């Protein structure tokens, strides 16, 4: 989660989650208004330059709608429900890892 906090220091990202454990590469789930995947990858990796190489982002899934308690992705204390978020993006993630 430290890597996610580092990425959030870039104002282009509103909310982020890194996915990569047990997978061939890291995908960034991001709430942002930016749509250019190459720009997002570059900006995220700029923030991750002091982290191990395996944390480097190779793909991005963008969502415009913020994650919230109402859509079930945040707890009442505004913590990310990681499992629910993974389930929510399962189809998109499967497509990237095929």
Feature names for model-found ranges:
Residues 1-55, 66, 71:
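AMP-binding/adenylate-forming catalytic core of the ANL superfamily
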Residues 15, 47-98:
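Conserved C-terminal "lid"/linker of ANL adenylate-forming enzymes
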């Amino acid at each position: 989660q430290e890597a996610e906090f580092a990425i959030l220091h870039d104002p282009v990202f509103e909310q982020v989650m890194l996915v990569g454990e047990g997978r061939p590469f890291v995908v960034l789930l991001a709430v942002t208004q930016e749509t250019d995947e190459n720009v997002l990858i570059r900006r995220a990796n700029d923030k991750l330059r002091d982290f191990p190489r395996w944390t480097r982002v190779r793909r991005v899934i963008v969502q415009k709608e913020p994650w919230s308690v109402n859509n079930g992705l945040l707890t009442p204390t505004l913590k990310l429900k990681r499992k629910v978020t993974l389930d929510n993006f399962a189809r998109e993630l499967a497509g990237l890892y095929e």
